[in-house]
Amino acid sequence: MKTKVAAIYGKRDVRLREFELPEITDNELLVSVISDSVCLSTWKAALLGSEHKRVPDDLENHPVITGHECAGVIVEVGKNLTGKYKKGQRFVLQPAMGLPSGYSAGYSYEYFGGNATYMIIPEIAINLGCVLPYYGSYFAAASLAEPMCCIIGAYHANYHTTQYVYEHRMGVKPGGNIALLACAGPMGIGAIDYAINGGIQPSRVVVVDIDDKRLAQVQKLLPVDLAASKGIELVYVNTKGMSDPVQTLRALTGDVGFDDIFVYAAVPAVVEMADELLAEDGCLNFFAGPTDKNFKVPFNFYNVHYNSTHVVGTSGGSTDDMKEAIALSATGQLQPSFMVTHIGGLDAVPDTVLNLPDIPGGKKLIYNGVTMPLTAIADFAEKGKTDPLFKELARLVEETHGIWNEQAEKYLLAQFGVDIGEAAQ
């Protein structure tokens, strides 16, 4: 089977590549990858090349396919797997394999990654339960289950303690104060959505950022009135220019501090602020992955000793987290489409990956069977004045107030003749 992929060839070197895949073995799957949402972790891998923990050597001869937030359709089933999978079945990939090597889809494999028209899912990923049946029909939601899975996993990884009781209570503190720092970006939107609609029921959620435009957008998507209707106080704060942001934020809790803090940017000042905002037994989750292996910040160990403050770091999520993300999206409790601001085809991947931090907006969603430059949804109407494809896409997203939706996805895929398979039974 001939495939077209976006692959890492070295540091800051991402290219389109077209080649014949080998025949699958009896314990592998050949799949068509319909959609992949671009992760900042992919940019980090492309930036570092083989210096990245998960990226192997010899990229020049064996380039690795980018992308891991993906979903698609099974095309061919190895004969030892016919009792579990069938041709035409939709799937979503759980890329967190948990291997000692750190290897996983989108970083480490020549034939296994989300930015591909076709890929081979290897035996090891199948044995680890990474291929989940997808019962829905909206591939964007399936792709976005992976970033939502990471967000959900972070909430589950936080923990709290009782003095002299040597068991951790996992999860955020019920009825507690949550601070989401540097959290008005694409992943932050998902974090706010889950805090309000995921059923964890904090009493207060404070969202902190320094970008008025991003804060205004997320407030439209997730307004304070929605949170209030669920018994949650939601506060949006721009700390840019504040003389004492720590005092201002602590005052929102009556100077008690925050029970659970999630840091969404690997910026020393943000981590230090998080430390100062912790309540007694407060848990700081360092969600943002740094590119610097020597990333260090001061931390108050007086509070560690006397106030039981503590730190966790999370990367990825479990299969159960993925299943929760899919289920909550299917019922409409979570709206992962809120995160999406740009749509593109496979041809857009190299430039998108290499310039991701400089492209404004939220998640960039790629449809591998589509040829289309990366385009902001907000620009569809203007482009539609001269292009009938964008004219219809603009009409379809207007029905959901500018949010990407299943009807727009189906129309786009149909224009390029993409086979979308059938829902898992």
Show where each model-derived region lies.
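Short N-terminal strand-loop motif that marks the start
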Residues: 1-66, 400-425
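Adenosine-nucleotide cofactor-binding segment
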Residues: 175-176, 181, 192-270, 393
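Hydrophobic/small residue at the entry helix of a nucleotide-binding pocket
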Residues: 186-187, 214
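Rossmann-fold NAD(P)-binding glycine/threonine-rich loop
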Residues: 269-272, 276, 288-308
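Helix-to-beta-strand junctions that scaffold the AdoMet/dcAdoMet cofactor pocket
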Residues: 278-280
